[in-house]
């Protein structure tokens, strides 16, 4: 899982992720932004579910993050609509609306994000 952190013209941090993990970047860009307390909450939840059968979920404005002891899933909240709402012959492209990654990989990105933000 490759990633890149950038600063926009206003100084805000933007995250770009490798193909297949774009939604993780969108989650950082839309849900986290400068809200490092959200990362505190996510890291605490990761410690709670790690090595257990439990899972944790937090719905944000645009994306929901879900994790269990081994993996993290981030999905766009818009995925909640049913296929019955689409016209016949149409399919919904959701490759950039759902990402799965390992817990350790995700926590490495969180740590790198914190480090990048702190160098402002």
From Swiss-Prot:
NCBIfam families: PRK05248.1-1 (NF003574), PRK05248.1-3 (NF003576). Belongs to the UPF0231 family. This is UPF0231 protein YacL. The lineage of its organism: Bacteria, Pseudomonadati, Pseudomonadota, Gammaproteobacteria, Enterobacterales.
């Amino acid at each position: 899982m490759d990633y890149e952190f950038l600063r926009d013209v206003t100084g805000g941090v933007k995250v770009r992720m490798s193909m297949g993990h774009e939604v993780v970047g969108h989650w950082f860009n839309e849900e986290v932004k400068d809200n490092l307390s959200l990362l505190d909450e996510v890291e605490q939840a990761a410690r709670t579910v790690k090595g257990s059968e439990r899972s944790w979920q937090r719905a944000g404005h645009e994306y929901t993050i879900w994790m269990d002891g081994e993996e993290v899933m981030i999905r766009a909240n818009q995925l909640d609509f049913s296929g019955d709402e689409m016209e016949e012959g149409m399919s919904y492209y959701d490759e950039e609306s759902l990402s799965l990654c390992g817990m350790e990989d995700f926590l490495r990105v969180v740590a790198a994000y914190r480090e990048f933000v702190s160098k402002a």
